[in-house]
Amino acid sequence: MKFQHTFIALLSLLTYANAYDYFTTTLANQNPVCASVDVIQNVCTEVCGRFVRYIPDATNTNQFTFAEYTTNQCTVQVTPAVTNTFTCADQTSSHALGSDWSGVCKITATPAPTVTPTVTPTVTPTVTPTPTNTPNPTPSQTSTTTGSASTVVASLSLIIFSMILSLC
């Protein structure tokens, strides 16, 4: 089982080691509907009724062989009707691939990573009240009543207010 996993990993490495992974393929003598078909590297694809495949080179990551087959049997055992080896240099140059075909090497764009914060900080303001010195009320000079209920309530309210302030 370990050998099988190693073989699959090696095979996928050889298949996808190339920098260019698809090709915009044009059949020159066809109508515009068939003029621009994207063909993935190493995948047998029908383009305008014909079958093509871009075979990557095992030693040069930018070199490919374009192959056209008469049937959908795009395998190594079947001899292609047309072959042409070329080297990709950029994503804009068109390569002549026989008398009828041309292709432009392409690289699948990798999206920029999305950064998602894992923790959203929460800021809770802390307010510390500053105690103020409240002057003691001076007795009113106009009042002649001492010990009245209103004075007791006012004094009691002042004491409670002072206690609440001291707790904060």
From Swiss-Prot:
Residue positions of covalent lipid attachment, annotated as GPI-like-anchor amidated glycine:
G147
Localization recorded for this chain is: Cell membrane
**The protein's name:** Prespore-specific protein A
Molecular function, one GO term? actin binding
Instruction: Pinpoint the residue ranges of every sequence repeat in the record.
Output: 116-119, 120-123, 124-127
Q: Which gene encodes it?
A: pspA
Source organism: Dictyostelium discoideum (Social amoeba)
Chain spans, region Disordered: 116-147
List the keywords (alphabetical): Actin-binding, Cell membrane, Glycoprotein, GPI-anchor, Lipoprotein, Membrane, Repeat, Signal
**Low complexity bias locations:** 116-131
From the UniProt entry, list the residue stretches annotated as the region 3 X 4 AA tandem repeats of T-P-T-V: 116-127
Question: Which residues make up the pro-peptide?
Answer: 148-168
| Membrane disposition | Lipid-anchor; GPI-anchor
